[in-house]
Amino acid sequence: MAGDVDDVKGLADAGGRLTRRRLLAGSLAVPIAVPLVGCATADPATAVVEQATKVDAKAPRRFRIAFGSCAKQSKPQPIWRAIGAAKPDLFVFLGDNLYADARDEATLRQRYAEFMAVEPLQAFRRSTRHVAIWDDHDFGDDDEGADYPLKQLSQQLFCDAWNEPADSPRRRADGIYQSYVYEAFGRRIQVILPDLRFNRTMLTADPSLKSSYAAMVLRAKLSGQPMTGWYVPDTRPGATLLGETQWAWLEEQLRVPADVRLIGSSVQFAADGSGWEGWANFPRERARLVELIRTTRAEGVVFLSGDMHYAEMSSIDVAGGYPLWDATSSGLTEVWDIPTPNRNRRSAVMAELNFGLLDVEPVTEGEDDLRLRFALCDVNGKAKVTKELTLSGLRFPEKEKTA
């Protein structure tokens, strides 16, 4: 067992109280469901506080998170060997964990059955603690959002496939958003998984840009120029990614005590100018999240994202705040090798099969600061893109804190 209820009794919600619920049995960990007392939502998804596996005294003092996205169930998936060899304490599935692309119930059910039959993936799941969110293809179909007609069925199929109990809030909320907290070497690492599909407003496409997809690809390959998508920012006040209920939930999550906060976004948060899916298509929503991070004084926020079929690091500089970094890892089976614009790109683009690693560890023994080591790795586990951050660099300036 990884711990008991008393291991986390010091954690409090936004209302200053921690309601301890029943232990959920598991061979790898002991999760504890923590309802957000006083949350503005009527039926919020719960946060889950989970004691990380005790680390041997001779082992490195770190918490290792692996992450990835975009695994087509009809293709070989050899990458799980390398991910397993990295021995992560947690794997975060960032969406497109299967490709349903379904317009009818029978197809949707069949695709989930195919996903459950991918033995390398399922064997990895049996051996490694993991959490998951969906993107469009496992939600239902390409680029779908709130109008997808099978979303309630998809919600239940997702919960079945990812072993959510019958009374899980993910089965009854307006989406599958969920949050977790892990404790390692006396520090708290929070993983927040917003649902960017269930309530998302229909995307806005520029008719002058939207042409035959095959023709766009051919032009890009022949010209050697970056290929920009056809989606444009929707600046209408009502356009949303999350919906108001989920926004209230997210605010509560950002107030939960944590040292490092990883927001698992199924689409890129920091990228700008690609013309494909991302928070950039909803500039009011992205600005709202930046402001929410500021008003809740949530420090140590970093984004993990998927979707793009390549890997890279991006960031947004926030006036009066700290840089918001976005580590994109995609895909586990899918590769896009045509250059795509991104004004906020901060690394080389890794256009090959990949997964991400993040080691959270003390900078030096006895100090308060933490080091966040990112590595975007190939199918053999070799790091191709790396980035190192410190928790001290993910904090508000002192004058901002006291303003």
Language-model region placement:
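C-terminal motif of bacterial Sec signal peptides marking the signal peptidase cleavage site
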Residues: V37-G38
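Metal-dependent phosphoester/phosphodiester hydrolase catalytic core
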Residues: R20, A25, T41-A403
